[in-house]
Amino acid sequence: MEVVLNEILPSSFSCTPATDSHCMSSLFQHRDPMLKKRDDFEDILEERRNSSDLRYALKCYTPVVYKGVTPNAASLLKTTVLQSDQLHYVVDQLSKETGVAADVIQEEASAILEEMAHRQQLSTVRFFAFTLSKAFKALFRSIHVNEEGIQRLQQAIQEHPVVLLPSHRSYMDFLLMSYILYTYDLVLPVIAAGMDFMGMKFVGEMLRMSGAFFIRRSFGGDKLYWTVFSEYVKTMLRNGMAPVEFFLEGTRSRTSKSLTPKLGLLNIVMDPFFKGEVFDVSLVPVSISYERILEETLYARELLGVPKPKESTSGLFKARKVLSEDYGSIHVYFGQPVSVRSLAQGKVNRCHFNLMPRHIPRRPSDETQCFVNDSAYSLVRAQEENMVLKPWVLLASLLLQNQSQGLLLDELTEQAVWLRGLSREYGAFLNWPDHMAPSEVVSSSLSLHRDLVKISGGRVQLALGGQGLMNQAVVVLSCTSYRNQALHVFLRPALLASAIHIATSAKKEEVYNSFSFLRNMLSNEFILCPGATLQDFEEACYLLGKTGALQMSQQEMQVTDSGQKTVNFLTAMLDPFLQGYQVRHTHTHTHTHTHTTKQADTFAWSLRYYELLSSDLQKNALAALLRLGAIRKIKVYVGFLHPCVPEWNLHSHINRLINSNY
């Protein structure tokens, strides 16, 4: 079906390659997988299976520390925070504004700090080391860690304050991080945790004594809380007593897609460098890849609207049955430490921070905020690039594109081998055991995920039959969480493949404008660095051309006959998202948000297109439609109205995208 580009692209979205900028190229360049050496991995559970867990927990633990660490810094942490110039300044300001005595506000600050602060004790750490060894050996076949990354981290800890930035796909993440650092005799991190965990009797206090400090999910306009919190984190960095660990995405990803980074804590940890209080800060992105996610069913049900269960000690004990399950392997990749000093070179003028005393709070300048935002996106990209993909990720991608009939086992194996080659060409960090026959690899993966697939008459299908609509949707959304792990590998070529199809001509400028529109529309859905449209376009051209799917001249580009299979696969990867945006827009008229969501859900159920039921997809689609001006939000007495903007007519635009015969 032909699509007129001018109908799709509002004039404000039209841009040319000459006017676009690049995004933090210091962290990301075009990758040729044949030129990049991957670090070697070590299975840290292998030794645990062959030696005493008690001896491991009670081992001599003497980690190397930051060369500038202040003696007794840990014991003086609370005192240092409460006596800080910035806290005193804010207390005095609040006292003047509210008329409340400064002593009363200071006591409130002390209470906030008492509720927040960690109290790390080695005895508790040893208890966790013993307990987690038992649990991990029961749950996982192996835990692989890149040794070179550990060596780089050990060196970084001695030279500068370190901030650990793990990806966040499971509750297991922060426990796993501390377990790994203890195994390698590295300083245990101080971890930012949500208040939800503090409410767990016994367990919450145990987490506090193993290095967790607890913060509210939202501070609102609470200046005192923000000041105590920021001073607490910055004091730890200035003193260098331990690495600070937090999740850049802010919360667990229920979809296995990277989430838009939150900037609050990143602003805080960069502030001591901006103000010249430390020479540098090292940011270490960490990628944690699970072969099978412990919470896969829980996440799928949450995405379908089932309320998240409250964290509780009793719930933890009820979850003990997972210990009898096989969750495969984990890969943990510690990335290259990123120097804030190097990142900021030529991008942030630190002289501005010397124009007023350090203790006076100030809002970040536009220049600084832009730098922090770009850094955050680039760090999440670094996490994505070092995610280790398992064979099941490829199998799930293929099965989701063949939900109705499934694939014969031999055909699935053949397709998986083809997709293995394509993903490697695109630079995927793929953990495919080449010493095994492809049929064995596929059979092993299907066995591990047998709850999600069925094999009948030599045909492999998703396990959808006779389970009821809710259970069928849970299976599909569980599978999408694995497919989503590979989206960062295929996203940019997929955007280009779709752009080529919908462009009015094969001219590069027309294709670029289509690419720019699609990228802009889906920027709530994926990690797409602001201002990097041209860089992403060039990467997509490079990858499609490299695999022979794209033929380019100076002015035009076309899909080759041999590349049609690749293009079909890539466009099918984006299809569920475009379908979801279409449904969301179709059922967003002059109704409240709740009514609209119910309408969209009902329509998706009727289609049995279960991916459209994901609350994450619907939320992102609504945000994109609002941002693009396709709808507007009007606050009324109950709920929100989302009337369409007639002149935008996005419905017809997305319809054309969806209904095009890829």
Predicted regions: what they are:
Residues 1-662:
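Membrane-interfacial terminal anchoring regions of lipid-handling membrane enzymes
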